[in-house]
Amino acid sequence: MSIDVNNESGTEVDEQAILDIARYALARMRIHPLSELSVIVVDAEAMEQLHIQWMDLPGPTDVMSFPMDELRPPSKDEEEAPQGLLGDIVLCPEVAAKQGAEAPTEHSMDEELQLLTVHGVLHLLGYDHEEPDEKAEMFGLQAAIVDGWRAEKGLTGPSPAPTVS
């Protein structure tokens, strides 16, 4: 799996954890091991510009996903998805820090960025949360992936509760 993490935000973030949880999420979703993903960490100003440009919404947001090859998880009878370029995930640590502090289970900026990385990966794979059934499926997968990764890493305490809707 080729995953690049590029921190352009000026904020210190745990890039290794972002890389690790992205790799875990893609493996868990059975994405081809030679697929490519880019994660860019930007400041609030850059995120606001992207949010306006692509969503026509004011203010910065927490995570945006830009799919490339529209890869999907393989069906039950397929071994793995075809190789391809997944796309880009853009994260904003300033928004993540605020959301983590305000979440039902308060958690750190880095924990929020890990959750948002999984959220972004799922969006790249075609998952969405516009409808209640879609939201239940996506957030269920998101929680299972974050919980599995935390267990594998030996992290204790409650997993971060979703702050994106």
UniProtKB/Swiss-Prot annotation:
Its main location: cytoplasm. It is an enzyme of class 3 (hydrolase). PROSITE patterns: UPF0054. Its EC number is 3.1.-.-. Its cofactor is Zn(2+). Single strand-specific metallo-endoribonuclease involved in late-stage 70S ribosome quality control and in maturation of the 3' terminus of the 16S rRNA. Belongs to the endoribonuclease YbeY family. HAMAP family: Endoribonucl_YbeY (MF_00009). This is Endoribonuclease YbeY. The gene is ybeY.
